[in-house]
Amino acid sequence: MAAVAALQLGLRAAGLGRAPASAAWRSVLRVSPRPGVAWRPSRCGSSAAEASATKAEDDSFLQWVLLLIPVTAFGLGTWQVQRRKWKLNLIAELESRVLAEPVPLPADPMELKNLEYRPVKVRGCFDHSKELYMMPRTMVDPVREAREGGLISSSTQSGAYVVTPFHCTDLGVTILVNRGFVPRKKVNPETRQKGQIEGEVDLIGMVRLTETRQPFVPENNPERNHWHYRDLEAMARITGAEPIFIDANFQSTVPGGPIGGQTRVTLRNEHLQYIVTWYGLSAATSYLWFKKFLRGTPGV
């Protein structure tokens, strides 16, 4: 105790009696502070708290961003349900048109806009001198396609559709009739004279409207008489007919002539696959989101 008292008296004598305890002990222990280094209380605890708060904010933001994936997938699945319903109604409407009883061809061309794929009946005669050729084409064979599981490309034989002006005697107008398919070696009418019908005939065919050129489809070449899609205005100018077009039915086929019934009415309906895909993705990502962010949360 005497030594401690003597030490305190010595410090006071040196003017250090009121110095902070830390400075006094550094003086006693002969520890020199590093230049520029301040002796302050540790902030390790507060820094850890700030980092934890920042991480919590980041996790919360990520949580709601990732929730958009299952929500969006569910919305797309619901949209596909509506699209499938619309497509089924459209298919049913087309089937009812195709199977309907043929009606006389309307005198007003404007009525045809609502009659595509509807059978109509006409009476008149062909003008074989102005044939047009839609090519290349493959033959539509419903019997073979049904036998082979609906394969559209079941026939690989290439050829053309023969489109011939047809003067309707009852209406007094000339229309365009797709008589049907001929193989490439029979495109020249000289090779199928037997099938060039003469005189007045009765026909039943399906109304077809004009087409717009699809991507990757070549342009029509009227100079070479090669038509890749139905441009009714251009075809009408070349032949002098009205822009009215029908596909003759199979019963119009004559020996040595084009094979009629070349109307394929097919609509892709893959919406059920899309429904399963989107709802499945929504369910899977919802489970992962729940497992990542809610599992282990108190009360969940």
Curated annotation (Swiss-Prot):
The chain crosses the membrane at residues 61-79, 274-290. Keywords: Charcot-Marie-Tooth disease, Disease variant, Leigh syndrome, Membrane, Mitochondrion, Mitochondrion inner membrane, Neurodegeneration, Neuropathy, Primary mitochondrial disease, Transmembrane, Transmembrane helix. It is a multi-pass membrane protein. Changing P258S: In MC4DN1; uncertain significance; reduces protein stability; impairs complex IV assembly. InterPro entries: Surf1/Shy1, Surf1/Surf4. One of its GO terms (cellular component) is mitochondrion. GO terms for molecular function: cytochrome-c oxidase activity. The keyword Metal-binding does not apply. Component of the MITRAC (mitochondrial translation regulation assembly intermediate of cytochrome c oxidase complex) complex, the core components of this complex being COA3/MITRAC12 and COX14. Interacts with COA3. Belongs to the SURF1 family. It is linked to Mitochondrial complex IV deficiency, nuclear type 1: An autosomal recessive disorder of the mitochondrial respiratory chain characterized by early-onset, rapidly progressive encephalopathy, neurodegeneration, and loss of motor and cognitive skills. Affected individuals show hypotonia, failure to thrive, loss of the ability to sit or walk, poor communication, poor eye contact, oculomotor abnormalities, as well as deafness, ataxia, tremor, and brisk tendon reflexes. Brain imaging shows bilateral symmetric lesions in the basal ganglia. This is Surfeit locus protein 1. The gene is SURF1.
